[in-house]
């Protein structure tokens, strides 16, 4: 996508860049100021900047939603058995555990669980975490043989009260955050982008 963007004459890539402020212009479009001081006007400002969207905040679009009282623990892991380019999911009493295939033979895991268990799993060393994950997944792909950096984030449902304003559109997690079960957040984000 980035390479295709570089090829388009009407696209100017500003990368890396971070948004400082944005405001609607009287003549239409949005004026944007970056943290490095650069400013420009755009006919369409797309907020694709995640659940804590700065674009949504600057556009003064409120959200509604609730907490699932769970955390998602995420990491990339390597398993003893090949994933066969198949996504796997196991439903545990505390929430689903998903193994999503990556192109290099690793899996991306999303382990939805209680905040307490997520914190306990994060506190484990790599060996003990790999053992806990292997057991939770019932050795379906053999032993977990390598664990990348781990992180966790709280799970919540969140919807922007508006997805569009004149000259502005919110897509992906900036517009709507859903439980990671079955990867619907990714699917919704891709549909948002295709709709634009």
Segment roles from a protein language model:
Residues 27-31, 149-158:
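Short gly/ser/thr-rich secondary-structure transition/capping motifs
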Residues 52-87, 97, 103-107, 113-117, ...:
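Central beta-strand plus flanking loop segment that forms part of the substrate or channel wall
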Residues 92-154:
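Conserved FAD/dinucleotide-binding core of flavoprotein oxidoreductases
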Residues 64-67, 87-91, 152, 159-160:
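Short Gly/Pro-enriched turn/cap motifs at secondary-structure boundaries
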Residues 1-58, 65-71:
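Conserved N-terminal helical subregion
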Residues 27-29, 83, 189:
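Pyridoxal 5′-phosphate
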